[in-house]
């Protein structure tokens, strides 16, 4: 299971079922769980914890120092869950300040040459395509899809089931359930394909699908300000039997409200309106 040319520090903790390919280097403080397969020419170092049944492809570099001049050599972490695919030459840097972590959840796919900067958090079932660069402190919610060859600014949040088109520049938050594309990035439409694949177009959940479409038109195609749109949606969600009363819309509204706080980047605007440039909702 361990190729004789692999260099594994005696202090590393590898489950007996872990496979390690030729010329891979694994550092002293690394922990790797059962069933994980590490291919050839991989470097895993630092305080890195990797769960079960992951596949790490040739050339990946995980747990090395952050690309941050503030880093002083402190104990910082990379935590990776289970069932992730980490393809060729992916880089995942550990966090910057003592005790902090860069986190990758479960069932994620990081395609070749993707970069996950320090302190990033990727939840579950996220797909990051080839050549994507995530700056520090980017947070990506579950089931988001990030197309290839694009950059995401530090501290940006990308919402659940969002879709980001290739070669975009993402410098502000991407709201959940939206399709975003462009340089600079703009909200173009609902992520209709993603919502359908998630089952929201089925008859039992069609009211959720319909409510999100109505909310999109209100937020991005009306003449209302963001504050007015959010006030309207918040009031509607409180009404008994309202079609706007569901967990998906609640999450969208909460995301936008939080995004507009002074410590956040603010949400991306729509393609033809500037209303989402407002802050401090």
Describe these PLM feature segments.
Residues 1-5, 10-11, 16-17, 53, ...:
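Terminal amphipathic alpha-helical/low-complexity segments used for targeting or macromolecular assembly
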Residues 1-186:
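Structural signal for interior beta-strand "rungs" in well-ordered beta-sheet cores
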